[in-house]
Amino acid sequence: NGTMQNTSTALTKVEPSKSTETVELKNGDSYDLTASYVEKDINGVKYKMLAYNGSIPGPLIKVPQGAEVTINFKNGTDMNTLLHSHGVRMDNKFDGSQSSQEEMKPGETFSYKLKFPDAGMYWYHPHVREDYQQELGMYGNYLVVATDEKYWNKVNREIPLILDDVLIENGKINLSKKEADHTLMGRYGNVMLVNGETNYKLSATQGEVIRFYLTNAANARPFNF
């Protein structure tokens, strides 16, 4: 089963990562989202990583176009962090960047009131120490469903895929928690992840039409299809 690799702190109890869930919200709903450490198995070795609501990627949050929802975010890590909703048009005070609010200290909570005026796929991630927090698994998707049924061509299924790469050397994910290192400037990983898995599999039937939503959460790597 491998051993627990210490990438960050000496936390004694870390829960295993869970499968990513899909959460459907409607206008006016609230949802609780927590960032915390998890134990993640990669090719038989357990690593201490970071996650939203215990999964890598975090929950797929599905909302109708035009909806306004509240994300009650808790910082369950031992570092400062923020929740940035990438590409979503919103009030600046809920942008989740250092220019819009103070960094959230460990244990603090903040309610992000988000509006989703545009259909499509977006993603959320930290805007503090992305070289560390995002690299260890803090990312997830929003799927904004178009109000116009003809906005997209009809398909049999929709599948979001988050692509990532992790750099593992000598059995460890070596990241500097104390300060940002060269990782911030870009690096290639040597282990590919699709929806958090090294061996992601998908079954399809002949004639089935599938719409894929692709998010590149890798540090610097381009992906060719």
What residue spans do the PLM features occupy?
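Histidine-centered copper-binding motifs that mark active-site loops
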Residues: 2-225
